[in-house]
């Protein structure tokens, strides 16, 4: 067998020849095809020769070459050597927006392949990259995992629950993991199968500078410094728009006033990922925001490249293991016309079965021809050069010349060997060839797999009110993608509570939960807690719908939307947006206007497939077009603006002109979808379901809230119990929310609360009031449900009374007048003031100087009161306490609902 110069120098531990370095340079520049002419190293499972730390593998000695960083000099990299013989720290300050971020490495996490600390203000994110010692089996998916965690200690907090240690990742942390993963994955070369793990922790958080965009940059720096042979450096920023001005990496306070929340990542020359939401910004404004962010990313990447040149590790380009070029030719020759016919099948399941059968046929034919063999121990391909006959063990190739030395590296065959391929290689190549054929069909023929043109959308139909007991429901179908959306309305108790670094009591009154069961694609799979994809798609749809919701003051409901994907063939998250919008209308939610979502695709290199070289944008992509294309760009909004967006790509970046073309084409698609949604049959009900709860909001004076709650919540519990409402929620600002299942109980509770919190005025007269309690010194009269006052015995009648019970009993009704409100808010009432002879009798008594008959009893009573004072004092205290706590409301008086609150 002929050993190539690059492979031979690798085995002899010599520097590779110049042309080998040139091939690596192109790979770094984003052209992995330049690696194809180089033979892949032989795979041997778990052997020392493939161990990264075993010493037998020699990495390429060529220096890492990156894209041009422009004319401006990058920020200075500072090297700080420890005076005590400790590790050397490298650091650089990078200008971002109106401030600098600090990147440090070399002094912490030294056993990782690379680790960095990135600081913005007092927010610090630590990221590390580690690789496995041996490669995984070949696959079409780069084995990379990302983990991000926000330590509560970063904000000086500890979990309030029983378990103090951080555990399962929160939804917000999962979303940040996806933000880190998605821009890094396109920069990884095909054929690199070493499992890679990125760990990121927030170690310090100042509540001002957000850690999520910082974590993207930290992971990008760590990856650039590590041995992973990524193609280009990436960085991430956040862009906000405040007062029509774009701000890079705005503070949390600035974001409160921002109309845009854009998180993006890219290289020094292209965009890799964008995600965010806005208040129906135009396409032009969004493009300006992306351009602003790209400028900041460019400067960060320049600085990172300078740091890599100073302290970066050599890249493992020699570990890239690609299928041999001959295999592509064999697969294309065998599949040929049958592959073209299979790709023309419109139905997804039938097409998948046809492609699977064709793949097996290709493997069978190659096996019969002697091209496919499987090593039983490792499942990797073997080369017949190891057992070639007529070999001369003394003859080897060194730098293209014969050397007859004693070093025996590889035998040289006098006959060209037949290459053996593994089944895994055949499957990988078949997938690539299928993708290539599909792209060629779209570019050359102008027709996609289902017969549509590039700008054409799939058929759309929708219907509402499928589920009679649900508060709102809709079924949205677009081609072979279908979403069943259900809306549930509730009170504050249904809100989604969030535990974050700063605010432990934050909650969401609107949230969308996305479910993607395996049955939606006709498969058998795992069922359980939502995975990262489901969390990410749900958040995207939630952000798309949130701007159209009415303010909480107008619609005080907690809204939960569930989107279950019943069929899937591309852009199921955008189907969730459309179905969710219809379900909201069906539930009677007064949305501002309808929204829709669409997924856009891309074939970037059309020249390769017979096109004119211009990028081809596809509207409403299917699953196959997503997998075979170069972009998945989801855009949601209405005819005039965008509410949410998310872009992932599979190539090393796209430019702003391509993005502009995609956004404008997406706007046309949204208009078409909204028009189709307006034809929904049956249409949305647009009224509250009879099964939805009723919520009424009242405003009372803040100092009256305690009257509603009562001692230990006694009063509010009694109102709920006796009126039958579901819940009563009070706020410190005087807001009272009543949730009930029927109007009758709602009106009862409204009347009770209105009377409890009313502000009585001296001189007001209350008619037909019930005596609730009789005491020796007077009677307690209920002037309104739950509000009582004391009518002293001297104010009960114009005649003298020895005991109140002599003339009145509990349950009697009298008219009273409010004559005094003391400092404690207690009411003093008088019935005598309303009697016709009250004023005349009082005047005659004053003129006579008082009668003897009245004085004697007063003296006798004084003695009696002296002997009974302790008992009467207790009674008075008990009555006062009862007055403060208010009586339990029972039957509502008609006057109760008429009394207003202030």
Swiss-Prot record:
The keyword Iron does not apply. One of its GO terms (molecular function) is polyribonucleotide nucleotidyltransferase activity. Residues 852-862 have a biased composition (Basic and acidic residues). Transmembrane segments: none annotated. Residues 1-66 form a transit peptide. It catalyses: RNA(n+1) + phosphate = RNA(n) + a ribonucleoside 5'-diphosphate. Residues 693-753 form the KH domain. InterPro entries: ExoRNase_PH_dom1 (IPR001247), ExoRNase_PH_dom2 (IPR015847), ExoRNase_PH_dom2_sf (IPR036345), KH_dom (IPR004087), KH_dom_type_1 (IPR004088), KH_dom_type_1_sf (IPR036612), NA-bd_OB-fold (IPR012340), PNPase (IPR012162). It comes from the Eukaryota. Belongs to the polyribonucleotide nucleotidyltransferase family. Involved in the metabolism of all major classes of plastid RNAs. Required for efficient 3'-end processing of mRNAs and 3'-end maturation of rRNA transcripts, but is not sufficient to mediate their degradation. Mediates tRNA degradation. May function as a poly(A) mRNA 3'-5' degrading phosphorylase. This is Probable polyribonucleotide nucleotidyltransferase 1, chloroplastic. It comes from Oryza sativa subsp. japonica.
